[in-house]
């Protein structure tokens, strides 16, 4: 039997390979993996930069809101808030403000009506020839509101209500008794509200005495109140601290 040749026993392969290992497919896979990793890294970097940019924008917006005390009134600070909601909030705020304004106006009007004040001091005192009385002419020293009006010798009530009324006359007369009468004229009749009587010293140097009266009365619109001294040519002290007349609406 003839001897076998080594060339006949060797495996056959493609021409030019000479029986070596196959390397081209492995190299291609490695290159594709390298490019994929590089592209993934670039995508991650771009996503990170985008997130950082958005985060910085949010931080600037928060800083702006903190600096201005909140979103603007025109709704720019809350872009997600709908226009109907903004209109409803604005309407509610306006209604609340309008109600508050009306309450203040009503309270102010009530205060004006309930706290009319008039304090009068004398200008002079005169006596009528046909009557045994002395009347005092007044002028306002303190006035608040429009419920009272001074008219020469009397005071006209413009606003009906309950009033504190006070009156004082300082006499400088040696007549044995002196006094004052506060009367009201209105609704077709005349009425005495209160009177005061004082005994006077007979010596001229000591003939000083004051007569003070006060009371609470319901006065009607159009009433005229006056102070009368039931003596002709009575001698009075016309200083503001000695003789005065006042009204306070309660």
From Swiss-Prot:
Post-translational note: The precursor is cleaved by furin.
Molecular function (Gene Ontology), one example: cytokine activity
Full protein name: Tumor necrosis factor ligand superfamily member 13
Single GO cellular component term: extracellular exosome
Source organism (scientific name): Homo sapiens
Induction or repression: Down-regulated by phorbol myristate acetate/ionomycin treatment.
Cystine connections: 196-211
Region (Disordered): 61-82, 89-108
